[in-house]
Curated annotation (Swiss-Prot):
Coiled coil: none
UniProt GO BP: translation
Claim: Secreted is one of the keywords in the record: no
Residue segments, region Disordered: 96-120
Entry superkingdom: Bacteria
Alphabetical list of NCBIfam families matching this protein: uS13_bact
Protein name as it appears in the record: Small ribosomal subunit protein uS13
């Protein structure tokens, strides 16, 4: 198994699909990385030469991925919460912060329903 940015890339996958195993690399960015490294996107990872793997590693290193990206996202949310703005307040409460309704729905963000004693 090849390792790029601390992630094991599956050998059986095509290069463009294998790169998407890295957090922060989607379809478009994976295609850009393959093009910049002059690697055929449909080549299987196990068939890549060491020079091609090194070129892919160099291209991936130019982007913010994996731990650095996760840390950046966490720090952005923490900054909003420390600032005390509306979005930070919603993050702190565990509610949707992009204007969705919460009277009904929003179960993903709010978690499972909490039982309330019914009227008797």
């Amino acid at each position: 198994m090849a390792r790029i940015a601390g992630v094991n890339i599956p050998n059986h996958a095509h290069a463009v699909i294998g790169l998407q195993a890295i957090f922060g690399v989607g379809q478009t960015r994976a295609q850009q990385i393959c093009a910049a490294a002059s690697v055929n996107p449909s080549t299987k990872v196990k068939d890549l030469t060491e020079a091609e793997m090194e070129a892919l590693r160099d291209q991936v290193a130019k982007f913010t991925v994996e731990g650095d990206l996760r840390r950046e996202i966490t720090m952005s949310i923490k900054r909003l919460m420390d600032m005390g703005c509306y979005r930070g307040f919603r993050h702190r409460r565990g509610l949707p912060c992009r204007g969705q309704r919460t009277r009904t729905n929003a179960r993903t963000r709010k978690g499972p329903r909490k039982a309330i004693a019914g009227k008797k």
